[in-house]
Amino acid sequence: LHIVGSSDVYKRQVFENTKVKARCFYIPDEPYFLSNGTAEDMKVFYQGIYPKFDAARFDKLLKNFELESRRKVQTFSKGMKKQLAVLLGICAGTDYLFCDETFDGLDPVMRQTVKSLFANDIEERNLTPVIASHNLRELEDICDHVGLLHKGGMLLSKDLDDMKLNIHKIQCVLPAGVGSSDLQGIDIIKTEQR
């Protein structure tokens, strides 16, 4: 596997640019934690990377989420690891929070709690979360703009309310001999023949 690409923020390369990195936090689908590390160890680690890391808030949220600060993260459930990753991201104090399938592995109550955290930071400190998800309904109550990626490119980028009114999923079986060329004027994302 050979991946080629770059990431620019404010027209600056992110790679090895500490000022730009300090403004962005990434929560992957499978969060990484220090080997044998605890939540406390992760807090100390991220305090060294993110100058605006709010340790007091992290400690308070850790208690609210009932996550033990001295327990090894490797013993946490998948949902607990996701919660910890979100708390670290929120408390990093960055302008941007990049999230990959952040709500996967969280129970419904915890999903709402995490959404409330995001909404609070959007309102209080103008946080911009960028959330990748296969579940658009999951994001309706916290997102106002949606971009759809398809085959490595941006298929569309729209205000969520506009998108709800103008985009429809239609699945149909066409008679033999009818192909996509017969459907001119319709923006087709995917066709499948059997």
Task: List each model region and its residues.
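Helix N-cap at the start of a conserved alpha-helix in ABC-type nucleotide-binding domains
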Residues: 108-110
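ABC-family P-loop ATPase nucleotide-binding domains
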Residues: 28-84
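ABC transporter nucleotide-binding domain
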Residues: 113-194
